[in-house]
Amino acid sequence: MEASPNDRLHFGKMGFGCKHYKRRCQIRAPCCNEVFDCRHCHNESTSTLRNIYDRHDLVRQDVKQVICSVCDTEQPAAQVCSNCGVNMGEYFCSICIFYDDDTEKQQFHCDDCGICRVGGRENFFHCKKCGSCYAVGLRNNHRCVENSMRHHCPICYEYLFDSLKDTNVMKCGHTMHVECYNEMIKRDKFCCPICSRSVIDMSKTWQRLDEEIEATAMPSDYRDKKVWILCNDCNDTTEVHFHIIGQKCGHCRSYNTRAIAPPVLPQ
């Protein structure tokens, strides 16, 4: 008994692919005319070439030809194989030339980002100033930084915009990978590597520093010494009494401060 057209479409689902995606086709990279399982496989391969001038990334939209993994037929990019009739990807984006059999990821294409995302369209919104899709919980609930996602992670330096790893938006609006953020916190680093703002609530730490300073008298030579500081949390500049333990911002009460030269007053 012959398989129905619908059964044929789903033949081999989740049975092919690479470590990045389950799909029933390979792509021919137009930049080097080589065949790879996916764009990431291409980029990983070319990034290790001996000659640095040969290293390059594949532009996803440039892919024109794919090879069906079921029947090995090379053909123009499309969802259904022109020869054997299988879906080469249960999810297919004709803009990104993106195939994926694992639809539990809830893939969707964002026109503003220009690429496909995962997690379900209803769970995300596109922030035009930050230049990327964010979880709906961040709508009107994050500090906008222009094109904040179109940068490299400040810890591992992987480009964030199209990274496969989860990304964290910090209180300051800057972004980094979730795993890099967690590792940073684990190592007792609580400031953004880019702007130095505190990334978590530090009020209890500031309270402990208040108590330490109150219990630690400075030598008489330093009791009246004052310094100018810049607060990394509120960007205010103030003149405060110097203390070896730390200088407290007179505006927001943070100890995340640094000494600066006195301001030059206009003549």
Swiss-Prot record:
Output the SUPFAM superfamilies linked to this UniProt entry.
Answer: CHY zinc finger-like, RING/U-box, Zinc hairpin stack
* Zinc finger CHY-type: from-to: 11-86
**Record-listed Zn(2+) 4 binding positions:** 93, 96, 109, 116
A molecular function (GO) term: ubiquitin-protein transferase activity
Q: Where does Zn(2+) 6 bind?
A: 127, 130, 142, 144
Which consequence is recorded for altering residue 174 to A? Loss of activity
Q: What does this protein do?
A: E3 ubiquitin-protein ligase that acts as a regulator of cell death and defense. E3 ubiquitin ligases accept ubiquitin from an E2 ubiquitin-conjugating enzyme in the form of a thioester and then directly transfers the ubiquitin to targeted substrates. Attenuates the activation of defense and related cell death responses in the absence of pathogens by mediating ubiquitination and subsequent proteasomal degradation of MYB30.
Q: What is this protein called?
A: E3 ubiquitin-protein ligase MIEL1
| Species assigned in the record | Arabidopsis thaliana (Mouse-ear cress)
Q: What is the lineage of its organism?
A: Eukaryota, Viridiplantae, Streptophyta, Embryophyta, Tracheophyta
